[in-house]
Amino acid sequence: MAGLSDLELRRELQALGFQPGPITDTTRDVYRNKLRRLRGEARLRDEERLREEARPRGEERLREEARLREDAPLRARPAAASPRAEPWLSQPASGSAYATPGAYGDIRPSAASWVGSRGLAYPARPAQLRRRASVRGSSEEDEDARTPDRATQGPGLAARRWWAASPAPARLPSSLLGPDPRPGLRATRAGPAGAARARPEVGRRLERWLSRLLLWASLGLLLVFLGILWVKMGKPSAPQEAEDNMKLLPVDCERKTDEFCQAKQKAALLELLHELYNFLAIQAGNFECGNPENLKSKCIPVMEAQEYIANVTSSSSAKFEAALTWILSSNKDVGIWLKGEDQSELVTTVDKVVCLESAHPRMGVGCRLSRALLTAVTNVLIFFWCLAFLWGLLILLKYRWRKLEEEEQAMYEMVKKIIDVVQDHYVDWEQDMERYPYVGILHVRDSLIPPQSRRRMKRVWDRAVEFLASNESRIQTESHRVAGEDMLVWRWTKPSSFSDSER
């Protein structure tokens, strides 16, 4: 391939369907590699075509074998239904292909004792033969159906004439004749039918596995949904745990030390905290479940909570403040939050407490279920919206990439057209068909792009001009005064055949 001239190289490429450009020292190796690759592809296509032509002949042979296998039982069935005696049990004819001496020597003595018509008993019939004949089933019928084809392929014309003149004899069971001498023939003939029967089985198996997969996926989604509901509803025993913690809290008894007073103070404090906890939990639950009382917040003002406790327990403000002081000094979670004006700051004294809020709102089952369902649906919608946004962004990026590729391809096509126009103009100038050896850039643009497409192709044209200015050495950009105005033109530079030193 290295010895090919430029003309031969161009002809080889054109014969393989590739239109090369100008062949120079810089592009000759590229075109040689291109020719080598095109020859390899042509060789692969020829091999594929030969394989495609050989495949129909194999399919026709398989169909012919299947047709012969279907016709064989029709020819063998009348002989099998004959009411006469079994021919293969009697002495075979002298001209028969089965009359070979000693062929069935091991079964001929026993066969003579049970030869007879179909209406007679067969006392001498071997029990082993009866068991084998009963086990064979449909496989024996298939083997009998191919007997005429084997007989017609026997040696000699006399065997074929005997077969055509005599009734079709019943063949010996395959269990007595030994293993099948052609085990591959049955598998070959049964291959297309078995494959045809296996296709629906594969489809049903695939459908069954898909249904199981969908079932398990549905069960998994159901379990995930129930888990989200359980987490959002929260543990119902949380308020009871808070009440148990309050009942176990110690009581401040600094002023009085007698046992009776301490017991009374403890009971009064626990009762006050219990009522305060229930009140705050109910108010917070009402605010979360529709807010029927039009509350501004779940955090209840201190004065409102103090009035409620005074009405229910008849406790003084001093006991209420003592309860708040104990909550601030306790390290246990009693389910009550004390908040100040700035709810982000931690309250340390009773004077800074502005409102009280329950840590465990008391809501009904329906409210908890609806809130959990709303939260789950919201999260699912947010997930799908994010997924749709990402999918749309991916589609937009793919569209952008495709447009950039199309624009780049259009730019390369425009570069080829510009090179052809400038080169043709130079050739015409050499033949005295043009006045100047250069051509204006705008003139080339107007000749290549129609007016209705110039705005759309402006970006492609600008990229093509930049590409020629930076990557094409055969075209030089010059400035000439044409009709009294400076104009950018392109001049084709013909490669010189001699260097300056040789001149």
Curated annotation (Swiss-Prot):
Region (Disordered): 42-97, 127-157, 172-198
Residues modified to Phosphoserine: 166, 175, 497, 499, 501
Gene3D superfamilies: 1.10.720.40, MAN1, winged-helix domain (1.10.10.1180)
Domain LEM as annotated: residue spans: 2-42
Modification note: Phosphorylated; strongly phosphorylated in mitosis compared to G1/S.
Gene name for this UniProt entry: LEMD2
PROSITE patterns the UniProt entry points to: LEM
Modified residues (N-acetylalanine): 2
Annotated region (Required for nuclear retention and interaction with LMNA isoform C), positions in chain: 74-130
GO BP term, pick one: negative regulation of phosphatidylinositol 3-kinase/protein kinase B signal transduction
Segments for region (Winged-Helix (WH)): 395-503
Record's compositionally biased regions (Basic and acidic residues): 42-74
GO cellular component: chromatin; cytoplasm; membrane; nuclear envelope; nuclear inner membrane; nuclear membrane; nuclear periphery; spindle
Protein's recorded name: LEM domain-containing protein 2
InterPro entries the UniProt entry points to: INM_ESCRT-Associated, LEM/LEM-like_dom_sf, LEM_dom, Man1/Src1-like_C, MAN1_winged_helix_dom
Listed SMART domains: LEM
Keywords: Acetylation, Cataract, Cytoplasm, Cytoskeleton, Disease variant, Membrane, Nucleus, Phosphoprotein, Transmembrane, Transmembrane helix
Phosphoprotein recorded as keyword: yes
Record's subunit section: Interacts (via N-terminus) with LMNA isoform C (via C-terminus) (in vitro). Interacts (via LEM domain) with BANF1. Interacts (via C-terminus) with CHMP7. Interacts (via N-terminus) with tubulin; the interaction causes microtubule bundling and stabilization (in vitro).
